[in-house]
Structures are given as C-alpha cells and as structure tokens.
Amino acid sequence: MPQPPKDEAPKRPRGRPRLAIDRNAVADAVAALFAEGGYEAVSVVDTADKLGVSRATLYRTVSTKEDLLGILFERSTNDLTQRATALIASIDDPAERLTAMIRLQAEAAVNMRSYLGVFFGGVGVPADVYARWHSWSRQYEKLWVGVVSDNMETGYLDNGNPVVTARLILGMMIWVSRWYRPREKISIEEIAETATHLVRMGHPAPPTRSTSTRKRARGQR
C-alpha cells in the first residue's frame, strides 16, 4: 500500500494540553511572589512561571492581577475563619480559648507577613478586593469580641469595652507581621505567650478545667 506523502502525515496539535489550575497552588504562588518582591512582584506572567504552566493556560482561570489577589484573599480569610471557628467550638474554657486565639493570630501574622499589611492598609489593592477584606474583617472581629466578652464575664480580663479590647488585641497581633524577622529567631510560641501575658496584665489565669471535664460538661447540656 502506498504511503501518504510526508506533508500529509498527521500533524501534532499545537500548544500545550490544557491543564486544570489548582486555586490553592495559585494562592501559594502569589504568596511566594509577595514574599520575594512585594505587591509589585505579583503578575499573571510571573504566577504562571511559578506554577510551571503556560500563560495562556493560567489566563483561562485568572486573567488579571486583581483575580490573583482575590484568590489569595479568599484562601487566607477562609482558612483563618475556619480555624478560629473550630477553636472556639472545641474549647469551652474562656481563658484557654483566648490563649488559643492569640496563638492562632500570632501564627497567621508570621505566615502572612508578606501581604497582611497590604490587605489591611489597602494601598494599591483593587477596590473590590479591599471591600471584601473589610467586610470579612468585621465578621472576624465579631468572633474576637465574643471571646473577649466571655473572658470579661469570667474575670480573666478586666471589665471594659469588649469591642475596643478586641480591636486592641487584634491590632497588636497584626502588627507582628510588620516587625517579625526570621533571623531574630523569635518563635511563634514566644510571641503568643508574651502577648497573652500583656493582655492579662500579669494576673494569673483562673483555674482551667481538664479536657475530660469539658467533655462531660458538654454531655450534660
């Protein structure tokens, strides 16, 4: 059987095969770019290079820098909200709950330090992304106000305005993202313990119940 001319042989499709884009991977790449060069270092082109995909592939999922910031925002806020909500639900003792929340916030400030200030400051951030961050921060603040109120009621914190107190604690913990330097070798645990000591102004925490006691208490509700 005669062979078809070479110029009639099946041709390989042009371009790379379409790849599914993992939004978590995109968020990781954007966070890495922030850490390397700040807000100006973030772009669709550089994110594609970080992910090892073609620009055309990434453009099908995210076409603008604003989209990239939105993905990082959603991942960061959802993770923080889920972890805070889980802590509040799993710890009955108010003192332990506040201590755990402060530790969580210290960890977030350290891990998100390259871009946390960008969202809170709003400088250079697209209006829609900043508006979503502002809306989320109000809801997140309510979680903190509830924890602070419980601690005031039980005497772990001095009585006062729980909203102002919650904002002051959050402000203190967010500021960690501005001054933290890995080379100083200050651990998250040290930051959390020092912050907790400051919040309670040196007063010892009230006796805490054991985990088994907390579980029994839940069963009696």
Protein language model annotation of sequence segments:
Residues 1-37, 41-50, 67-70, 217:
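Basic, helix-initiating cap at the start of DNA-binding domains
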Residues 1-14, 141-153, 172, 178, ...:
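C-terminal peripheral helix-coil segments that are non-catalytic and often amphipathic
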Residues 20-28, 40-41, 49-52, 60-85, ...:
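An amphipathic alpha-helix adjacent to DNA-recognition modules
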Residues 56:
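Key DNA-contact positions within bacterial/archaeal DNA-binding proteins
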Residues 71, 85-111, 166-169, 212-215:
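Hydrophobic alpha-helical connector segments
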Residues 78-81, 128-154, 163-167:
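Amphipathic alpha-helical packing segments from all-alpha helical-bundle domains
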Residues 97, 108-128, 145, 178, ...:
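Amphipathic alpha-helical segments used for helix-helix packing
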Residues 99, 103, 145, 162-170, ...:
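Short, well-structured alpha-helical segments
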